[in-house]
Amino acid sequence: MNLPFRAMVSDLDGTLLTPEHLVGDLTIDTLRALEQKGVDIILATGRNHTDVSSILGKIGAERAVMITSNGARVRDLQGNLLYSNSLPEELVLELYKTPFDTSKVCMNSYQDEGWFTNKDIPAMRQFHKESGFDYNVVDFSKHHGRGTEKVFFIGKTPEDLVEVETYLRDKFGDVTTIVYSALACLEVMNKNVSKGDALKHLLESREYELKDCIAFGDGMNDVEMLSWAGKGCIMKDADIRLKMACPELEVIGSNKEESVARYLRTQFGLDY
């Protein structure tokens, strides 16, 4: 069978998932049909693998791969670690000292042991209601830095993160990757960590290349993945900074309409 692409690579929030952060029925049917045709399903997200495992379980894609924490980890559906790039522990401890207004910003970390945050914000759970993935409130001044995938800051508004971003880039810009995964979520990973880099590492063990992938995304943490794939598609409601960074890429519909699934059905000739 002559397939237009060997792999479908997609971001989750704002892209593959509905605005309620759930997997739509059309999306489930589409990804199952693609896997039956031999197309690899690769989900690339800022989320933790515990989150993504639950989503993949609902999709039912048996051979799917998870690129998580913006590329800091790659796992198969069985949870086997295929690639890892952690922040150095001593660097993490310095990141914990980042100054910010605690009334407007919260600090978080994804580590091998789970999700940690400096304050209890129940609204954050809405992003994880499908998986039940939950946070632990800690005092970061006393918390360890082992096995850290990323440290990230969530503001009430994008403006709340301006000073945090300036501080991080000035102090850690040379040794980390700093990127927005959403308008008010600023994330810090180890140097050269991105979804695109993780995809490159994954494909070293596959019989096809980046040009054989179609990718979908909506945030600044998708730039490399979308730019390097054979076909990159940006969501209609994507971060305007992404559209400006990748003006050559096609803009498709919104996640509300399950536009990734609809686009894939057209590309691969799947009936409704």
Curated annotation (Swiss-Prot):
Alphabetized GO MF terms: magnesium ion binding; phosphatase activity
Active site positions: 11 (nucleophile)
CDD domains named in the record: HAD_Pase
Cofactors that this protein relies on: Mg(2+)
Name of the protein in question: Putative phosphatase HI_0597
Similarity section: Belongs to the HAD-like hydrolase superfamily. Cof family.
Source organism of this protein record: Haemophilus influenzae (strain ATCC 51907 / DSM 11121 / KW20 / Rd)
Top-level EC class as recorded in UniProt: hydrolase
Recorded superkingdom: Bacteria
Keywords: Hydrolase, Magnesium, Metal-binding
InterPro entries the record matches: Cof (IPR000150), HAD-like_sf (IPR036412), HAD-SF_hydro_IIB (IPR006379), HAD_sf (IPR023214)
Keyword Iron-sulfur on entry: no
Residues binding phosphate, per UniProt: 12, 45-46, 195, 221
Lineage: Bacteria, Pseudomonadati, Pseudomonadota, Gammaproteobacteria, Pasteurellales
SUPFAM superfamilies: HAD-like
Pfam family, one: Hydrolase_3
EC number(s) on file: 3.1.3.-
